[in-house]
Structure formats: C-alpha cells, structure tokens
Amino acid sequence: MRRELLLEKIETYKAIMPWYVLDYYQSKLAVPYSFTTLYEYLKEYKRFFDWLMDADLTQAPKIADIDLSTLEHLTKKDLEAFVLYLRERPSLNTYSTKEGLSQTTINRTLSALSSLYKYLTEEVENDQGEPYFYRNVMKKVSTKKKKETLASRAENIKQKLFLGDETLAFLDYVDKEYEQKLSNRAKSSFRKNKERDLAIISLLLASGVRLSEAVNLDLKDVNLNMMIIEVIRKGGKRDSVNVAGFAKGYLESYLAVRQRRYKAEKQDLAFFLTEYRGVPNRMDASSIEKMVGKYSEDFKIRVTPHKLRHTLATRLYDATKSQVLVSHQLGHSSTQVTDLYTHIVNDEQKNALDNL
C-alpha cells in the first residue's frame, strides 16, 4: 500500500476510535512502531469493538464512546467468546470456502489486543502516575500455535526457495528471457520497469531484508560503494545490512534510470519508485508482492518476497554454517528462528549424498 494511502486509511480508523486508543497510537508511534503495524492493529481494534457492541457487552452507541470500564471488566469467558466468534464467523474473503478466520489471523488479533491491554494496565500513566486500570484479562487468554516440526516446515518451504545456481538463474531469466513471451503491449510496460524490478528482486535475494524494509528504503539509506543499506527493523531499531555483491550491477542500472524514467525530483526520497500520470510515488508492498509473484511463477513456482528472504538465509547458512551470522543478517536477536535453515541445508546435503 502506498504510504499516502496508508496514512489516509490510518486517519479514517483514528477518527472512530476511543480516546485511549489514540493515546496508545501516539505512544507506539514514538517507539516507533511502523505505520503498517499500527494500521493493522487499528483494524483489529475496530473488529473487536464492533463485536463488543454486537454482543451487547457495551451500551455505547458507537466505537468512540466505549469506555475504559468496559475493557477493565471483560471476563476471560467474554474473550473466549470473541475467539469463538472469530473462528466461526463467515469469511469475508469471497474466494475462500473456509468458515471463520485462520489461527494465524486470530493470533494476530489477540496479539494486537494484548498490546493494547498491556499499555492500559502497565505502560500508561494518569495524573497520579498510575495506569488506567490494573486488571489485564488478556493474560488469561491463551493462543494456539500451529503445530509443525522444523523438519516438516523445512520440507514444505524448500521447494519455494531459489537455492544454489537458481538465485542468479532467476535474475537472468527476468533479465533475458521473460520478455520473449510477452505481447508487444506487455513488452512496453516490462521494459519501463525492468531495471527497477531487477533491482528489487536482487536486493531481496542479496540482503534478506523484509518486504516492509525494502519498501521504506530511501535514497540516503543505500551505499553502493560499501554495499550496505540502512533499514528500520521490527520494533523501530535502525540497522545496517550488508548486501551481496551480485546485486550491485542491478542496483546501479536502476539508479541510472530512476530520475528520468520515474520523473523523480529532489523531494522524492523513496528508493523504489512507481510513476502514474507523471507523478512519482513510493512503490508499495502489494505491488512488489505481485511483481515477485509474477516473475517467479513464470520462472519456476510462485513465491512471495518473504521466500526470497528465506532463500538468502538458507544460502548464507550453507556457506558459513553460522546461525549467529544468519540471525544478524536477518535482524533477529536470537538464533532460535534460524534453526529452520539448518534443517533445509541438512536436507540438501543428504540429497547431494544420495546422488553420488
């Protein structure tokens, strides 16, 4: 979503929220939480407040009028009823035949509510230096995590990674072969954005940054001499990320055409731009997801930008056998999340031995 559109949607949600949610928003903006995270949280709060009114757990006529006392006195049974509602409600996705939300979505909703409750019961201070209330019912609500062993997850994910020679083969395919299948009209659009698209894909494959980190990249954040980029990690921490050398040529080619092709002026700070009717804008996450999906599907299998992050992590672990190095590259504070890559690499080694 374009930054301008994202901020517009955030303001729409803020306009209907109770005052204490606006306090929460300002507090988390100072951390800083990303606008994307805050937008997702505001959506979850609307979902929750709508349910409170539908379930007659508040007498408030509108969301903005739901008072703190309502949240303070909700019971564990009330929150469990909300979870059941999420699990059983008809899906709003017209393309889905599933009833209710996925466990992942439910966990995200509960995470957003836990964050709000923690703020109200622990972090905020009233005029007496005390939180607004003390009873945090969210601490009594448990979440169910998807049960899957690392070995099973590794098996499921490795088919969607571009390992070994496939990393550069994917870039070469987009660069030299993809165009041959296109109509003349489609070729025109492809040629306009070819350098930019290759720069994005190569950066994701060469650095392992998250999609949001690539989207929010500004010109000043990119140092091609050192092959280092500056990103804002989850939790608002600024980090320097090394970029593999194979991306340099693609990034330089894009920079050579960025100003002219996307009508960029000095005030256009975003590194990756799109242009519509002569107006440059920061390329949004949805557009990058569609672009990566389009090229990868034509090459081998449709993947997301996050799978390109997994690709870099797996290749880096294969080359170094260092979970610490991989976790630093990905911006993780613990090596626990990198255990997945050891399973993928071990599987690859086993397959190589079987072929001897």
Swiss-Prot record:
Keywords: Cell cycle, Cell division, Chromosome partition, Cytoplasm, DNA integration, DNA recombination, DNA-binding
Subcellular location, record wording: Cytoplasm
CDD domains: DNA_BRE_C (cd00397)
One GO MF term attached to the UniProt entry: DNA binding
Designated name of the protein: Tyrosine recombinase XerS
Keyword DNA-binding carried by entry: yes
Record bears the keyword Cell division: yes
InterPro entries: CB, DNA_brk_join_enz, Integrase-like_cat_sf, Integrase_catalytic, Integrase_recombinase_N, Integrase_SAM-like_N, Recomb_XerS, Tyrosine_recombinase_XerCD
Regulation: FtsK is required for recombination.
Naturally occurring in which organism (per UniProt): Streptococcus pyogenes serotype M6 (strain ATCC BAA-946 / MGAS10394)
Residue ranges of domain Core-binding (CB) in the record: 16-121
PANTHER family registered for this protein in UniProt: PHAGE INTEGRASE-RELATED (PTHR30349), TYROSINE RECOMBINASE XERC (PTHR30349:SF77)
Tyr recombinase domain segment(s): 169-354
Family membership: Belongs to the 'phage' integrase family. XerS subfamily.
Role, per record: Site-specific tyrosine recombinase, which acts by catalyzing the cutting and rejoining of the recombining DNA molecules. Essential to convert dimers of the bacterial chromosome into monomers to permit their segregation at cell division.
Gene3D superfamilies: 1.10.150.130, Intergrase catalytic core (1.10.443.10)
Active site: R210, K234, H306, R309, H332, Y341
Gene Ontology process terms (BP): cell division; chromosome segregation; DNA recombination
Entry GO terms, CC: cytoplasm
Superkingdom of this protein's organism: Bacteria
Phylogenetic classification of the source organism: Bacteria, Bacillati, Bacillota, Bacilli, Lactobacillales
Pfam families documented for this protein: Phage_int_SAM_1, Phage_integrase
